[in-house]
Amino acid sequence: MVEAVYRCFKCGREVKLDLSITRDLRCPYCGSKILYKPRPKVPRRVKAI
């Protein structure tokens, strides 16, 4: 079971989808096909060269 958290671009809700059961990526609330993975809130530090 592969469950991933996505955020809908249209309504902004977080959606948990099980990708092993279905390949259809749609928001169950508004029906939008545009979903993206939210970034973590931890700031990243990159050492400059």
From Swiss-Prot:
InterPro entries associated with the record: RNAP_P/RPABC4, RPABC4/Spt4, Rpo12
Keywords per UniProt: Cytoplasm, DNA-directed RNA polymerase, Metal-binding, Nucleotidyltransferase, Transcription, Transferase, Zinc
Protein localization: Cytoplasm
First-level EC class: transferase
Cofactor note: Binds 1 zinc ion.
Entry function: DNA-dependent RNA polymerase (RNAP) catalyzes the transcription of DNA into RNA using the four ribonucleoside triphosphates as substrates.
Family: Belongs to the archaeal Rpo12/eukaryotic RPC10 RNA polymerase subunit family.
NCBIfam families in UniProt: PRK00398.1-4
Protein name (database record): DNA-directed RNA polymerase subunit Rpo12
